[in-house]
Amino acid sequence: MIIGHGIDLQEISAVEKAYKRQPRFAQKVLTQKEFDIFEAYKGKRQISYLAGRWSAKEAFAKAMGTGIGNLSFQDIEVLSDEKGKPFINRSPFTGKAWISISHSGDFVQSSVILEEEK
């Protein structure tokens, strides 16, 4: 049974500005595994990755019904499988979490559906 659905739309350039103002922004948003991947990217791909993880975590918090204020960005880890499909590797939710991250131009959109396991 679906118990939550969260959607987030994020302007990539806004995340880039935040990162340029405060480079530790990436370490606040990303887990260590995510940060290692982030550091392997360069330029626009690096910022796009950071914005995607930010958006995904915001969408997850909305699906939980709590907003990010009651969660830490470190509580949620979003990785990708060998084909590039994102998945939630770690979170406080014990059921199944479905995630989609889409980039287009200066925007990234994420959708998270939380499903209670029977």
UniProtKB/Swiss-Prot annotation:
Mg(2+) binds at D8, E58. InterPro entries: 4-PPantetheinyl_Trfase_dom, 4-PPantetheinyl_Trfase_dom_sf, ACPS, Ppantetheine-prot_Trfase_dom. Its EC number is 2.7.8.7. GO terms for cellular component: cytoplasm. Belongs to the P-Pant transferase superfamily. AcpS family. NCBIfam families: acpS, pantethn_trn. This is Holo-[acyl-carrier-protein] synthase. It comes from Streptococcus uberis (strain ATCC BAA-854 / 0140J).
